[in-house]
C-alpha cells in the first residue's frame, strides 16, 4: 500500500486526521456527482468501475488514479463499494452564514448527538425542510464520519453548519440576533401549535439517550 492509499485510509478511520488535513472521503456515484468540483483534491476508482460504461462516462475528462478492486475494497468504508471515491476539502462556515441572508433564519441546534447515521439523516431532513443552518456542540459525533457523510445524501455540501467551541455562548448570540429557540419538554406549558415559526427560530435536539 502506497502513501496515497494510507492517507485515504487515515481519513476514513481517524477524526483527528480529517481535522488536521481539513479533508474527508466521499464514496459512490451520487456523492461524487454532487461534490463541488473546486473542492475535490483526489479521485480514486477501481479497475472494474473504470471498465464499466457508467464509470467511463463519469470519469471522462477527469484526472484520477486507478487501483485494483481488492485495494479499493480495503480503502472503502462500505461493505459493497461502488468503485469510486474522492478526497474533498472541508468547507468552513462562519456563524453569520447560519443566520441566512435571503430569508428568516430557520436553524437546528444539535447537542451531543452520538450516532453518525442519526446526524446524517437529520441533516438530510433539515435540508428538505428548508433549514438555513445547523449549530452543533463540539461533543457531537464528527460530521465528516464516513457513515454520517453517506447518510446526508449530499446535504453536507449545501447546508451550512458550525461546530461550536462555545455552545452556550453561541446560543445566546442567536437569541441576541432575534432567533427564538424551541425545545420539546414534557413539562412545557406552551403547545408547539402556539408558536410563531415564521419569525427567525431554532429547534434544539439533544443526545439520543439523555436528551437536552
Regions found by a protein language model. Name each.
Residues 59-89:
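Glycine/small-residue-rich loop that forms an oxyanion/phosphate-binding "nest" at active or ligand-binding sites
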Residues 59, 84, 151-155, 198-202:
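Short, hinge-like loop/turn segments at secondary-structure boundaries
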Amino acid at each position: 500500500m502506497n502513501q496515497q492509499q494510507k492517507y485515504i485510509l487515515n481519513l476514513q478511520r481517524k477524526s483527528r486526521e480529517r481535522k488536521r488535513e481539513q479533508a474527508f472521503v466521499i464514496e459512490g456515484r451520487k456523492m461524487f456527482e454532487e461534490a463541488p468540483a473546486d473542492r475535490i483534491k483526489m479521485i480514486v476508482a477501481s479497475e472494474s468501475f473504470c471498465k464499466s460504461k457508467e464509470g467511463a462516462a463519469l470519469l471522462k475528462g477527469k484526472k484520477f488514479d486507478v487501483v485494483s478492486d481488492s485495494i479499493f475494497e480495503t480503502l472503502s468504508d462500505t461493505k459493497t463499494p461502488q468503485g469510486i471515491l474522492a478526497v474533498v476539502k472541508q468547507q468552513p462556515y462562519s456563524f453569520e452564514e447560519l443566520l441566512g441572508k435571503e430569508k428568516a433564519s430557520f436553524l437546528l441546534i444539535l447537542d451531543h448527538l452520538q450516532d453518525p447515521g442519526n446526524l446524517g439523516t437529520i441533516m438530510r431532513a433539515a435540508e428538505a425542510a428548508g433549514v438555513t443552518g445547523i449549530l452543533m456542540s463540539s461533543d457531537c459525533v464528527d460530521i465528516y464520519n464516513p457513515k454520517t457523510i453517506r447518510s446526508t445524501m449530499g446535504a453536507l455540501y449545501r447546508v451550512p453548519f458550525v461546530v461550536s467551541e462555545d455552545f452556550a455562548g453561541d446560543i445566546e448570540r442567536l437569541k441576541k440576533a432575534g432567533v427564538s429557540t424551541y425545545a420539546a419538554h414534557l413539562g412545557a406549558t406552551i403547545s408547539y401549535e402556539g408558536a410563531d415559526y415564521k419569525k427567525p427560530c431554532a429547534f434544539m435536539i439533544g443526545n439520543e439517550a439523555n436528551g437536552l
